[in-house]
Amino acid sequence: MENHEPDGTIIKENLTDIIARKINQLPEAERNLLENGSTYVGLNAALCGLIANSLFRRILHVTQARIAAGLPMAVIPFLTANVSYKGFVSLPLNTGDLQCETCTVTRGGLVGLVFGGLYPVFLAIPVNGGLAARYNSALLPEKGNILNYWIRISKPVFRKMLFPILLQTGFAAYLGSRQYKLLIKALQLPEPGLEIE
């Protein structure tokens, strides 16, 4: 018996190769946006993380360990948003699995909202809470009131972070739309090496 690959795998590889060749025909600026769009979403997520970190540090009166708290608040949201945008939007677009502009915009917006906006704010809570407990900079609650305390502390931060979160969501959705249009433009280009008479 011979080991054969299913026909779908061969078609998928050919489709991926065709899309990659077409993308390489785009001008450099457009190709850069198509290939590195997830990095821009990650940079915005890192900025949201630093803003949330700063707001929680002010509320909890934490003045020590600026770099120790700022570094993970920039790096972790950057990596998370970058990888999730690449996995949910860029990779499916480049492999032909995502073929609907509305789906691309929705996926991009959701990744921007969850991983680029909300996740950095939620990540700032334990980071700065741990620093406040370590340096005794704020009066922390008793065991029974922990949830109410963090909800009360987080409300003003979420109000102030509303604009950056919405901006991140809108930016990621716009980027998804732009990448979809660039991919359609690339697919309409003639095959390299073919001469049209």
UniProtKB/Swiss-Prot annotation:
- GO BP terms in the entry: mitochondrial protein quality control; mitochondrial respiratory chain complex I assembly; protein insertion into mitochondrial inner membrane from matrix
Q: Which family does it belong to?
A: Belongs to the TMEM126 family.
Per the UniProt entry, the signal peptide is none
Q: What does this protein do?
A: Protein required for the cotranslational protein quality control in the inner membrane of the mitochondria. Associates with newly synthesized polypeptides and may act as a chaperone that cooperates with OXA1L for the insertion of newly synthesized mitochondrial proteins into the inner membrane. Required for the assembly of the ND4 module of mitochondrial complex I.
Query: What membrane topology does this protein have?
Result: Multi-pass membrane protein
Q: Which UniProt keywords apply?
A: Membrane, Mitochondrion, Mitochondrion inner membrane, Transmembrane, Transmembrane helix
- Decide whether keyword Transmembrane is in the record: yes
Q: Kindly report every residue range on the membrane side named Mitochondrial intermembrane.
A: 57-58, 129-160
Q: How does it assemble?
A: Interacts with OXA1L; promoting cotranslational quality control in mitochondria.
UniProt protein name = Transmembrane protein 126A
Got a GO cellular component term for this one? mitochondrion
UniProt KW Secreted keyword: no
What is the annotated localization of this protein?
Mitochondrion inner membrane
Where exactly are the transmembrane stretches of this chain?
Answer: 36-56, 59-79, 108-128, 161-177
* One Pfam family in the UniProt entry: TMEM126
Residue ranges in the Mitochondrial matrix topological domain are 1-35, 80-107, 178-197
